[in-house]
Amino acid sequence: MGLFGMMAISTSALSAERERAEVTSANLANAETTHTQNGGPYVRKEVVFSAANASPFQTVFNGMGSDDEPAGSVSISQVVNDTTPPVMRYEPGNPDADAKGYVAYPAINPVSEMVDLMDATRAYQLNASAISAAKQMVQESLDILKTT
């Protein structure tokens, strides 16, 4: 795999991590949303990653140093709804309360969502750094060619 293959992998990871950060931010923003267009509380969403163009390790290992093998990348296979039931809170004066006075709130833990958001941010930063390093290697290679 060449430098451009490395850049393609990191670029796909940037896109996937950006989407994960957006979904996590939406979860945080709607942590107290008790009424949606569907009538119930907001449902937490989760991003599922998948490997695209993945090859078995032995195939990649045998092809080391050649550009014939397409680079693998990461993609988002789907965004799924969390199946955790809503948290019921007793609030008899709330307009969204049921007959017993309970309101269904999303099963979202803001602390774990913040950890997920920080994780997505760090992964994004690392992939951006990998792209910068690959660009710097290409630039230095061009500089070497200019001097010869």
Model-derived regions: residue spans:
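Amphipathic alpha-helical polymerization modules
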Residues: M1-T148
